[in-house]
Amino acid sequence: MRKSKLYLIGLLVLALSSCTSKKQQTAEITPNVPKIILETDIGNDVDDALALDMLYKYLDAGDIDLLGITINKEGTYPAEYTDIMNTWYDYPQIPIGIIHNGADCENDATNYAKAVCLIQKDNGEPAFKRSLKGDYNQLPEAPALYRKLLAQQPDSSVTIISVGFSTPCTPVGYSG
């Protein structure tokens, strides 16, 4: 009975790792693929992480061009967790925009991003690599990142995928 449980656990770990493994090759982005900006309330659950995982898989296949990720939750853990994911999937160059005065998830009863960011190895080092160095509060404001990314693209050529709130989108529409 014990061996069969260990075997099943091993199979489960193998199955899960194959779903979230790093990309095996660098994808070539073709000019006709959709250009995407992800708007996310990443932090208190895993739906956003799964959506981001799917976008990385589309990037790997060359099916999209992910221009940036904007976060609409207050605090450093959502941005740090997004940096961990960008690094894990080998896309550290994807810019991250943050929001101030957004929804506060730092003290949520369930804060998935915080839990992952605080995992440490036995030697006290973070368990997951990050690409960005320094204070995550110094990342560009999401509306400013939107304006920058959208200004670099032809009109009507970018799709914004929103998972959660749309806090950073609103100021972009009212700003010059």
What are these regions (language model features)?
Residues 1-8:
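Bacterial N-terminal signal peptides that target proteins for export
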Residues 16-18:
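C-terminal motif of bacterial Sec signal peptides marking the signal peptidase cleavage site
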Residues 20-176:
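N-terminal acidic, glycine/proline-rich low-complexity segments
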